[in-house]
Amino acid sequence: MADFFQNGVITTLQNFRNRSLEELEYELELFSKRRNMVLLLPALYSEFEGPAMPKIIQELKDIRYLYKIVLSLDRATEEEFKKVKKIMSEINTEVKVIWHDGPRMQRLYRELEEAGFNVSIPGKGRSVWMSLGYILSDADAYAIALHDCDIVNYSRELPARLLYPVVHPALDFEFSKGYYARVTHKLYGRVTRIFYTPLIRALIRILGCNRFLVYLDSFRYALSGEFAFIRTLARGIRISPTWGLEVSMLSEVYQNTSFNRICQVEVMDTYEHKHQKLVKSTSEGLVKMASDIAKTLFRVLAHDGFVFSEAFFRTLLTTYLQEARYAIEKYNALSLINGLTYDRHAEIEAIEVFVDALKKAEKEFIEDPIGVPLMSAWVRVRAALPEISDKLIRAVEEDNSDD
């Protein structure tokens, strides 16, 4: 039986697999006559040397409903930037490559820094933020979809299903979040399965049915990097430069729109990308990600007026451990009935590492409750620097016109 269950406070749009991709894309082509759609692809140059990017480019060649594709390129030399431009020129849709390491973009980053905007931390968050600024400079762009560029089994169904809810004229969604299964011969998505979700549920047990926490618990894959939103929402969104990007994005959406305009969409059957090993260092990898996520949660809740004490954090640690143990029991049963490999010992070891990440997050939050500020919404940036949009357009155009 197809899954049609609606849980939580947002709408869930499952894939019943009874409709062809071609039919979906045909509708999107009709919608594109009135609502221009932009696809934003944050990428490192190294991803062009891996197995995922060639497949993504091949799939994008067949899309006809997109107004523009913006590739946000990080960690690339001039030669590598030129190589990427040539590769992306194979796509029929108009493509603009934003070279964040180039001298023109670096000048803009310095100008923003001098004006008091926090853009000093390089990474995906900053690149996405600057790329959004470029896209929003085009008044004809209506909806923006974003997905990562390390998806080995990529299908053009992903952007189609992400964009459909926010551009369909008979629907009223402003934000859609992608979800999928992270399954091969075993379950992946450890940070979501045995850290994020147990932590959210531990917080609910302690703080009660807080609307924000219930909202976060409604997402099937809150840490996915795939989402779409309309420009009027995007222009008021602040973005985190840290690993807390996805959680802070959901927080900003929560504050800037209403539940009935938020949905989650099943975009793929399964999702394969590069898997990170769980190292015990709290300053890198998945543990750093978990720590940043926890700090982001604490700060958002503190903004809502919650007071955190030493007793609260002691209770949270033990409650999280209990919720994580419940999760292990559930995923062990799920793996057994589906014939998957499930290493309970490795999962328990991962929880112990995540407890260290949680302790680190608590310590850093107490020492610095404000932490790394979110990068300002573009509506504020434009108010302070009225010419920034023109400068951004000029920098990208000149970079893309150079031989």
UniProtKB/Swiss-Prot annotation:
<comment type="similarity">
    <text>Belongs to the glycosyltransferase 2 family.</text>
</comment>
<feature type="binding site">
    <location>
        <position position="150"/>
    </location>
    <ligand>
        <name>a divalent metal cation</name>
    </ligand>
</feature>
<keyword id="KW-0328">Glycosyltransferase</keyword>
<keyword id="KW-0533">Nickel</keyword>
<dbReference type="GO" id="GO:0016757">
    <property type="term" value="F:glycosyltransferase activity"/>
</dbReference>
<dbReference type="GO" id="GO:0046872">
    <property type="term" value="F:metal ion binding"/>
</dbReference>
<protein>
    <recommendedName>
        <fullName>Glucosyl-3-phosphoglycerate synthase</fullName>
        <ecNumber>2.4.1.266</ecNumber>
    </recommendedName>
</protein>
<keyword id="KW-0808">Transferase</keyword>
<comment type="function">
    <text>Involved in the biosynthesis of 6-O-methylglucose lipopolysaccarides (MGLPs). Catalyzes the transfer of a glucose (Glc) moiety from uridine diphosphate (UDP-Glc) to the position 2 of 3-phospho-D-glycerate (3-PGA) to form glucosyl-3-phosphoglycerate (GPG). GpgS is most active with UDP-glucose, followed by GDP-glucose, ADP-glucose, and to a lesser extent, TDP-glucose. 3-PGA is the only acceptor for these glucosyl donors.</text>
</comment>
<dbReference type="InterPro" id="IPR029044">
    <property type="entry name" value="Nucleotide-diphossugar_trans"/>
</dbReference>
<comment type="subunit">
    <text>Homodimer.</text>
</comment>
<keyword id="KW-0170">Cobalt</keyword>
<keyword id="KW-0460">Magnesium</keyword>
<keyword id="KW-0479">Metal-binding</keyword>
<feature type="binding site">
    <location>
        <begin position="189"/>
        <end position="192"/>
    </location>
    <ligand>
        <name>(2R)-3-phosphoglycerate</name>
    </ligand>
</feature>
<keyword id="KW-0464">Manganese</keyword>
<feature type="binding site">
    <location>
        <position position="273"/>
    </location>
    <ligand>
        <name>a divalent metal cation</name>
    </ligand>
</feature>
